[in-house]
Amino acid sequence: MKNLFTLPLAALFFLFTAFTLKQDTPSQKLASVDVKGLDGKIINTGTFSNGGKPIVVSFWATWCAPCKKELNEIAEVYEEWQKETGVKVIAVSIDDARNSTKVKPYVEQQEWTYEIYLDENQDFKRSMNVNNVPHTFVLDGNLNVTWQTNVYNPNGGVEAIYSEVKKAAATTAAPAPENK
């Protein structure tokens, strides 16, 4: 009899908690700060675009094993993701100036086809409230953050990212309601 009341009560609690958390999550746009490309050119993150399609921004570092594992897993399915959703992945290294020379050789060795940027002074990291890496954001086509995670989960984490990419793609692709 006790279980008869406990289960519905627990379900109600989790539903209420999930609704409350979703409701209280503030909307966040992509910050606009300068970062450096691997070619040394400065670019403002506010100019990131993908033709109205989703963008994944992944903060990582060469010394972060979970970051590299996550980005390598994404690399294995990136072409498929692009075909299905048009997503663009942008990997932002937070290696400081002393270590940033390791980024380009590592990226070339891994043959990542992502856009790679250096956030040597960590302005972008701070403006996006990134406290640890890996920290991955999913943005809709309007550069609004729709989802984020700051952990690497080797058991389904990349699939969770892609699930959110598909949601962002569907939301962005949905036609705007007509005003009559």
Stretch-by-stretch model annotation:
Residues 1-36, 147-149, 156, 171-180:
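N-terminal targeting signals for export/organelle localization
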Residues 34-55:
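A short beta-strand-turn-helix
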Residues 52-55, 60-63, 96, 132:
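Short pre-active-site segment immediately N-terminal to redox-active cysteine/selenocysteine motifs
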Residues 56-57, 89, 136:
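Hydrophobic beta-strand anchors of alpha/beta hydrolase catalytic cores
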Residues 64-68:
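Short, thiol/selenol-centered motifs that function as redox-active sites or metal-ligating centers
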Residues 69-110, 121-127:
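Structural microenvironment flanking redox-active thiols in thiol-disulfide oxidoreductases
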Residues 106-112, 120-166:
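Thiol/disulfide oxidoreductase modules built on the thioredoxin-like
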